[in-house]
From Swiss-Prot:
Gene from which this protein is expressed: ndhL
Gene Ontology terms, MF aspect: oxidoreductase activity, acting on NAD(P)H, quinone or similar compound as acceptor; quinone binding
A Pfam family per the record: NdhL
Stretches that traverse the bilayer: 15-35, 53-73
Membrane topology: Multi-pass membrane protein
Keyword match Flavoprotein: no
Primary localization class, coarse: membrane
HAMAP family per UniProt: NDH1_NDH1L
Function: NDH-1 shuttles electrons from an unknown electron donor, via FMN and iron-sulfur (Fe-S) centers, to quinones in the respiratory and/or the photosynthetic chain. The immediate electron acceptor for the enzyme in this species is believed to be plastoquinone. Couples the redox reaction to proton translocation, and thus conserves the redox energy in a proton gradient. Cyanobacterial NDH-1 also plays a role in inorganic carbon-concentration.
EC number: 7.1.1.-
Gene Ontology cellular component annotations, sorted alphabetically: plasma membrane-derived thylakoid membrane
Species annotation: Synechococcus sp. (strain CC9902)
Protein name: NAD(P)H-quinone oxidoreductase subunit L
């Protein structure tokens, strides 16, 4: 049984629910954590204490998505060059 035949057998309400779950899951695990990584990298040295508190709260909230991308993103400092 191919994928198209499987989709045609499901009721339309079920497809809407699956699409909604996929959108929420994609937002929670992919979109927001990547945007948060970009924001942290851009503003790391210029954040106020309240902005930093808010960012840390968002990191706590979106921790599962942050863990998904942690092995692939390197935000360490560049260092002093050749020593």
């Amino acid at each position: 049984m191919d994928f198209q035949a499987l989709l045609s057998q499901l009721p339309q309400e079920t497809l809407f629910v699956l699409l909604a779950y996929g959108a929420v899951l994609g937002t929670y695990l992919i979109a927001v954590p990547l945007a948060l990584y970009a924001w942290i990298n851009l503003r790391w040295y210029r954040m106020s204490k309240f902005e930093r508190l808010g960012v840390y709260g968002l990191v706590f909230l979106f921790f599962p998505g942050m863990i998904v991308f942690a092995p692939f993103i390197n935000l360490r400092l560049s260092g002093q060059g050749e020593v």
